[in-house]
Regions:
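Peripheral, non-catalytic segments flanking oxidoreductase cores
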Residues: 1-346
């Protein structure tokens, strides 16, 4: 469980913008990340070593989901086989909003542009985790910019996991094998506006991420909330020039319990008198090891990443038909608040 924080810390990555950062600067940065991941599990990262700006990132969302973006028919041509049985893609591509589900979003996902396609990747699973990306036929520039953004975030993740290793008392190369045939996912998300007639405040139910690291670009609309140890939901609005980093369940396991994967959700934008409900865009990047990567914790536990991922996917709505019931281990916000109140009493 996280500590009793009231806001997210801010960590500057200015040291990573240097062509040759000093060992002392890198050690200090690793120490900051250790503190963050031991307490909040979330932080803002500023002074980013990226060429893509905030506007560049959300222009991709607007070109895909916006008023002048793709029609629903065009998006469904890219939909996963779960939603369009005649389509070939099972893991990458588009997923539509699910009627009746609390997670009100649609998304477009792509993987590592250079990932090796494995003929045995599916095994006994219906999902091919190393399949090629799918893109709309035009414009070609959209493909290129998505791939470039993915590459930049993958490179930043590689720098961060090197620091993570140092923070855990390991050599900086300890996680280098995670980068081989990485399955990292870039996800463009659109949370449509919710009609006032629909009494729903949560647009993404409380959860932790399942993998290693998540890097999140969020727009100015906001809505991200992070849960502290008291069960309070702490708003994490957009900070100019920042992205948000958080660790997933797997990195918490790798740390031997030293670090925490913190619950978070997203709420609808605040209601304003006479103002139309507003949607939002969000662009998370999930840093993931390769399909056959053996992920080992510092206390000796091991798991094959592909097996871990396939197990987690069973509970993700975008890989289920609309008729599939939600898993019992997904708690509503009300359920979580009740649980936390009982914990306090006990």
């Amino acid at each position: 469980m996280s500590t009793s924080f009231s806001s997210l810390p801010i960590v500057s990555l200015a040291a990573l913008k240097s062509f040759s950062p000093s060992p002392d600067d890198l050690k200090a940065l690793a120490s900051q990340l250790n503190e963050v991941f031991s307490t909040t599990g979330f932080a803002y990262l500023t002074d980013l070593p990226l060429t893509y700006t905030h506007d560049d990132v959300f222009r991709l969302c607007d070109e895909f989901f916006g008023p002048n973006g793709l029609s629903m028919d065009e998006k469904m041509k890219l939909a996963k086989k779960t939603f369009v049985p005649t389509n070939c893609n099972t893991y990458r591509g588009y997923f539509p909003p699910q009627e009746g589900d609390d997670n009100l979003k649609e998304g477009f996902e792509l993987g590592t542009p250079t990932s090796r396609h494995s003929e045995s990747a599916m095994g006994t699973s219906e999902f091919d985790l190393t399949e090629p990306n799918v893109f709309p036929p035009s414009p070609e520039e959209f493909h290129t910019r998505c791939k470039t953004l993915h590459n930049e975030l993958q490179n930043l993740s590689a720098q961060l996991v090197s620091l993570v290793a140092v923070a855990l008392g390991k050599p900086s190369s300890f996680f280098s094998h995670y980068l081989e045939d990485s399955l990292s996912t870039l996800r463009l998300l659109h949370y449509p506006p919710i009609p006032e007639s629909r009494q729903q405040e949560i647009v993404c139910t409380p959860h932790t991420d399942s993998g290693i690291l998540t890097l999140l670009h969020q727009d100015e609309t906001g809505g991200l909330e992070v849960e502290n140890c008291k069960g309070d939901w702490i708003p994490a609005p957009y900070v100019l020039g920042s992205i948000v980093v958080n660790i997933g369940d797997l990195l918490a396991r790798v740390s031997g319990g030293r670090w925490i994967a913190t619950y978070y959700d997203r709420v609808r934008s605040s209601k304003k008198q006479g103002v139309e409900p507003k949607g939002r865009y969000s662009v998370p990047f999930f840093f993931e090891p390769g399909l056959e990567c053996v992920v080992q914790s510092i206390d000796g536990g091991k798991v094959v990443y592909g097996e871990h991922l396939l197990g987690k996917m069973k509970g993700w709505v975008e890989f289920q038909n609309a008729s599939v019931a939600r898993p019992n281990d997904v708690l509503s916000r009300a359920d979580r608040e009740l649980r936390n109140s009982l914990v306090e009493v006990l």
